[in-house]
Amino acid sequence: EGDIEVDVDTIHFGYPDGVAHNAETLMYDNVEQILYIVDKYDNSDAMGVIYSLPFRTDYEGMQVLTEWTKLGSGQYFMNPTGGDISPDGSKIIVKNEPFMLIWERNEGESVADAMARRPKQVKAYKKESQGEAIAWLDSTTFHTTSDSDVNEPIYMYTKNINDAVENVV
C-alpha cells in the first residue's frame, strides 16, 4: 500500500559509431556483472549486434558500449525483440517474432563468445504477435508474453531445454 521511494541511478551510454540504434534487448549477466544490449540490425548482412558495458554503480559521464559480435545472418536473427541470461549464466535466450534461440555457455566463457556460436532453436515456441518479453526463472524454465492485447497470457516453458531445441542451420 502507498508509495515506495527508491533510488535511481542513470547510465548515460552511446554506441561506438556515435549513432542511435534500435535496440529492445537488454540482458544482465550475473556471472560477469556485465550489461548486454542487442540491437535489431546494423544495415548489413548480419542481423543484430551484441554490445556490452561492465555494470557498476558509480558511472560518471557518457559510457561507450563495446561491440562484440553479430548474431548471424538470415531469418533466425532478424529483429531481436527480447532476451535474457539465466541466473546461473549457463544459458542465453534471444527471441524475435518467429523464433526463440538458445545458446549454451561453457564455464569461464563470456556471453559474447558463447553467442558467437550457432544457437539452438526452441521447437515448442508458441508464436506471439508482439512477443517481446522473455525471462529465465532458472536454467531450465523461462516465461514469455506479448504486449499486443489487454489479456495476453504468460507462457511458461519448463521442458528439459535439451529435448526442446534443434540446431539452427
Where are these regions (language model features)?
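Sequence/structural signature of beta-propeller domains
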Residues: 1-164
